[in-house]
């Protein structure tokens, strides 16, 4: 049996008297496409912040590739193979697309133009390499955000609302990129409010509500679950 790439074991997070996560446990297999859904305030962002190292969990353990990483800084987790794209892209607007990619490559100890060119080709931004990031469209900014995450050569990529605000055809573009990256062996956690995108992409989905997992299963099972409909869809 293949060992999981990520185990979240009884993770809790508190902000003062508020419990954002309450003993959340998930296990993700290498190469899996994993969806994370839930209403606003359900704990999705807190969970991925704990996984990526932006926040330190108050209870429980986070194990990546067989090693506990609960107390590692975010940059240490990145170097171990966890990367994340953020919901709101914040590129260096005075830099070109290529320069924006060379910065994270240098951070992880590589600055190869050839590697940057290959990432841009994979993401679909090769023809925008010399373009200032301030001139990019919304979907191009989302692609650049994914490219910057790929600079870390991740084994686990967390895609945080990469399709928010995009048109249907643009959502299809981003989904194709994520499918292609997954086909190369990258495990992907997708956090997304666009339910159709999550259901098309994910092999397995969990739904959070009030910091707890209320349902876990296939996309088909999730959309039919009464608890999910009440919590996430307002039914």
Each language-model region and where it sits:
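Glycine-rich phosphate-binding loops of nucleotide-dependent enzymes
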Residues: 2-235
